[in-house]
Amino acid sequence: MIQLVPIPFIAATVFLLIRAQFRSEQRRVYFYKPLSTLLVILVAALSFSAPNVKAGYTAGVLAGLVLSLGGDVALMFDSRKAFLIGLVLFLLAHVAYSITFALFNGFYLGDLVSGGVLLALAIVVYRYLEPGLGQIKGPVIAYIAIICFMVNRAASAFLGSAFTPAQAWLITVGAVLFWVSDLMLAINRFRRPFERHHISLAFYYGGQLLIALSPAYFG
């Protein structure tokens, strides 16, 4: 499948990005970070050539990825304003994914199970981060809520018939990896900085790649 061709290049650029982050080579970060996201966008765009493709779903995934690209660029700059811009863009990316998953799959009673688990996790995460949030508690609450909703919509793929089993796994694991990467970043920024937080990029790009692959697997 042509959608798989960019994957080795994504693996290489993400590795080089993480290495540049650890070495504080900012110019290389400015190059490899948007390049990695653009390659993931290419994976999703190539799904238009797949059999049984649903253009609306692919467009929704691409919208989430393009908004994520904007968030990636914003977060390369170390300022409060850039952070808030990145936060808003990633929040909108999660909204785009959530709407896309919901429109194509709907809602089910079983969603309450994953919803309850995610609500409990959201409360625990917020209470842990709260002492370091300062004046941005509101935006962080909104972000936690929407990313948990996005994971809930992704997990719902297992309950309906709109997605194939392969897609359900790609979407759900991708969403969870995205959630984990954001959690690592939040802990590092607001509560307990840790030296190897750049590893979160592996979770982030892994999650985005799995979501980007999902449009190519309609039955």
Q: Which residues does each PLM region occupy?
A:
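Polytopic alpha-helical membrane-helix bundles and their juxtamembrane interface segments
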Residues: 1-219
